[in-house]
């Protein structure tokens, strides 16, 4: 997921800066907002959505356990949370599966506030948007809201190699192999860890699904990546844990949704729906149904 990877790396850089510590918007420069764009292009009001009986969610394609299609049927954590939102608003949830762009800015521009130059569709809501105050003030065209979970980095491992009292930590990967998603934050972290001492043992895969498949097949000793993806790919021969990760600026982040800035009433309604589902346990049950740990968001 190029957009999420690039965005999380950027957030790590922001978090390490002095401007962020004092004022996340200290170096903020005003951005252009959409001009002369029709209502059917930039989004829709609440009453229009309820009259038409459905709303459109942008979700990332081929991204288990969060959003994918199985025999043409949408599945995943983000799909089920989107359905909760739509149900609370009294409409049907429809989905636009999108590929990740170069960064989160591009994804928000193409899917929420402007539209792609060719064949783009504007969604009412975009799921799985990393929430950060420094990034939030840099994208005026979008309302960041509806924080519904946290994600964090973990390490999955072969239980035949590592015993319960000797689970792997990054220092082990000076000698042991570890699988990561190529160009992910885990890849960048391990490549620079201890002055690059573990970089030679890092095995890179196109995505975490393939990385976990390699671990389960005994082709690598461990895998490092987002906890949810690791848990979803576990087998009877593998397990996962979360050791302290020294120097990892963004080992945990909050996930929410994005709505076009022109439709704040919709953003409020979406946030309310998510808040209710957090309070009554429905979102936690969604994670449980996919065999995942639920990490409550900071709201």
What are these regions (language model features)?
Residues 55-59, 168-186:
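Short loop->beta-strand "edge-of-pocket" segments that line small-molecule binding or catalytic clefts
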Residues 83, 87-97, 172, 183-205, ...:
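Ligand-binding cleft/hinge of the Venus flytrap
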Residues 149-156, 227, 231-274, 293-299:
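Periplasmic-binding protein-like
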Residues 22-40, 82-88, 159-163, 175-177, ...:
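Extended ligand-binding regions for polar small-molecule ligands
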Residues 23-25, 31-124:
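Extracytoplasmic small-molecule ligand-binding "clamshell" domains
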Residues 127-138, 191-192, 216-251:
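A ligand-binding cleft/hinge motif common to bilobed small-molecule-binding domains
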Residues 95-170:
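Acidic, polar ligand-binding/catalytic clefts
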Residues 85, 112, 214-216, 270:
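Hydrophobic residues within well-ordered alpha-helices
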């Amino acid at each position: 997921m190029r957009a999420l990877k690039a965005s999380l790396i950027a957030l790590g850089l922001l978090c390490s800066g002095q401007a962020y510590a004092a004022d996340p918007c200290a170096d903020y420069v005003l951005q252009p907002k959409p001009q002369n764009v029709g209502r059917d292009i930039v989004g829709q009001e609440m009453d229009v959505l309820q009259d038409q009986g459905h709303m459109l969610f942008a979700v990332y394609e081929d991204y288990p356990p969060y959003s994918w299609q199985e025999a043409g049927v949408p599945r995943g954590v983000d799909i089920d949370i989107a359905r909760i939102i739509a149900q609370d608003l009294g409409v049907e949830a429809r989905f636009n599966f999108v590929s990740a762009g170069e960064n989160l800015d591009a994804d928000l521009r193409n899917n929420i506030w402007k539209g792609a130059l060719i064949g783009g569709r504007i969604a009412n809501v975009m799921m799985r948007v990393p929430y950060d105050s420094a990034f939030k003030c840099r994208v005026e065209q979008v309302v960041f809201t509806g924080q519904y979970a946290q994600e964090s980095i973990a390490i999955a491992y072969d239980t035949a190699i590592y015993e319960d009292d000797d689970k792997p930590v990054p220092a082990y990967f000076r000698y042991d192999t570890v699988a990561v998603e190529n160009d992910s934050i885990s890849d960048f972290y391990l490549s620079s860890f201890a002055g690059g001492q573990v970089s030679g043992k890092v095995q890179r895969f196109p995505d975490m699904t393939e990385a976990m498949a390699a671990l389960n097949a005994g082709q690598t000793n461990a895998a490092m990546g987002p906890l949810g993806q690791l848990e979803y790919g576990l087998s009877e021969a593998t397990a996962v844990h979360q050791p302290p990760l020294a120097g990892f600026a963004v080992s945990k982040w909050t996930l929410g949704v994005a709505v076009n800035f022109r439709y704040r009433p919709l953003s409020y309604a979406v946030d309310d729906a998510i808040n209710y589902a957090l309070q009554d346990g429905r979102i936690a049950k969604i994670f449980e149904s996919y065999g995942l740990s639920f990490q409550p968001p900071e709201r």
